[in-house]
Amino acid sequence: MTTDLLRRYARSPRGTRASDHTPCSHWQTHTVVAALRPTEFTATAVFDGPMDSITFRAYVEQVLVPTLRPGDVVVLDNLAVHKQPAVHAAIEQAGAHLRFLPPYSPDFNPIEQAFAKLKAFLRAARPRTFDQVCDLMRTALALFLSDECANYVRHCGYRVAT
């Protein structure tokens, strides 16, 4: 996620061109990491900069693992930083099961749909600093109701216990 997020489409009165201000400075890259349960977002973190193996390992050990319950299933895509043995060990030591999605299959990843809504919210709000992104994330995550989270999970073909 970058601080140059803008809406891609706009409306304007008939006969006039839609226009908007675009920042011309260098943007900043931020990484949003979260876990999606059928009831809520959990283990949410925002990092200043791109994701690397050290950052992901710290996220798993310090943020994700404390929220896991025995029997939880952690589903990860095939990003290289997800395949660290220390990450696997930390998740399994918490009593959770680790599963990887098939390659090139975002349709099976419910958090991708939720992040699309999240990015639309951030585009409308136009954060330009790391602090603004963090503040807006708190606001945006409150917009996700438990029914909506369950629907994201169901839409990807997973069963949701009632």
Segments (PLM) and residue ranges:
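Short functional hotspots at interaction and active-site rims
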Residues: M1-T162
